[in-house]
């Protein structure tokens, strides 16, 4: 009786694995899904394990580091998912660096390349609607992995790779600040700011509630008053009701701000 019961359980688990793996398909620059439906912890953990295994397999002979950076954007539960995958990355024999706050994907890519670590996993859905979330994989050069890589990740998932998570072990780094300091090492930001003031140019930057919010202000050490103004820098998981993509149809607040600035200038 126990034999047949276990056999039935195995069959059901196999069906579940097939269902899970069939919903995981990589698209442009990563895997994405709707939060709570196809993007859930069960699917994400499988993708993370397969991604880590493939990063080790393909690049361990090209980089000595066993460190993986985990970054995340400002979407609903992004930080929670980022912290939740740490035990699975650790279980693959890799060390974790966790971003201290929300961060852009380019910042993660720069950090990986400059510190010569194995790669990065970024919890983000880029420009997709608010109810989406996803995972981007970056190789040791900070670049997006290619289609051959993601096909291998999908193959590993279909094989039913399951790794038991272990106790979280990670270090926290300010990835955004690292990027800002790198830019400052190349450019004289005070000179740029002074030139903008001299030319009487005011710059408006629409963060669209995204991960770049307040970065420009930090880049100029907070000395941007009357020269650079941020728009929609506060956190909003709904992104003002539109996808966070800089298309003309989604930039009403920026357009209105510019029109108001023009009207004020004409009055003076």
Question: What would you call each of these model-derived segments?
Answer:
Residues 43, 47, 81, 104, ...:
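Catalytic-loop motifs flanking and including active-site residues across diverse enzymes
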Residues 3-5, 61, 68-132, 219-268:
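N-terminal small/polar loop signature for handling phosphorylated ligands or for N-terminal nucleophile
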Residues 40, 74-75, 101, 142, ...:
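Short beta->alpha junction loops/turns
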Residues 28-34, 72, 120, 135, ...:
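Gly/Ser/Thr-rich helix-start
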Residues 1-92, 169-203:
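An N-terminal, well-structured beta->alpha segment
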Residues 2-21, 133-266:
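Gly/Ser/Thr-enriched, mixed-charge loops and adjacent short helices
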Residues 30-31, 128, 207:
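Conformational gate/switch positions in structured elements
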Residues 34, 98, 140:
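Short, flexible active-site loop motifs that bind/organize anionic cofactors or intermediates
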């Amino acid at each position: 009786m126990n034999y047949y019961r276990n056999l039935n359980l195995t069959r059901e688990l196999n069906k579940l694995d097939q269902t899970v793996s069939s919903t995981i398909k990589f698209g442009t620059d990563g895997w994405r899904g709707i939060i709570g439906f196809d993007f859930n912890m069960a699917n994400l953990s499988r993708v993370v394990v397969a991604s880590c295994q493939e990063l080790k397999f393909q690049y361990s002979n090209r980089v000595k580091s066993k460190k993986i950076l985990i970054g995340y954007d400002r979407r609903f539960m992004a930080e929670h998912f980022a912290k939740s995958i740490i035990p699975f990355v650790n279980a693959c024999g890799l060390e974790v660096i966790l971003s201290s706050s929300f961060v852009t994907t380019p910042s993660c890519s720069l950090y990986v390349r400059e510190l010569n670590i194995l790669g990065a996993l970024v919890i983000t859905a880029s420009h997709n609607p608010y109810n989406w979330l996803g995972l981007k994989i970056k190789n040791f050069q900070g670049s997006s992995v290619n289609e051959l890589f993601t096909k291998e990740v999908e193959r590993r998932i279909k094989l039913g790779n399951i790794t038991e998570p272990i106790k979280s072990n990670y270090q926290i780094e300010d990835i955004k600040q690292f990027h800002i300091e790198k830019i400052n090492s190349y450019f004289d930001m005070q000179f740029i700011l002074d030139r903008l003031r001299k030319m009487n140019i005011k710059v408006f930057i629409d963060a669209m509630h995204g991960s770049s919010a307040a970065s420009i202000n930090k880049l100029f050490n907070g000395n941007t008053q009357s020269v650079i103004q941020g728009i929609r820098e506060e956190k909003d998981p709904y992104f003002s009701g539109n996808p966070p993509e800089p298309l003309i149809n989604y930039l009403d607040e920026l357009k209105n701000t510019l029109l108001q600035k023009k009207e004020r200038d004409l009055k003076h």
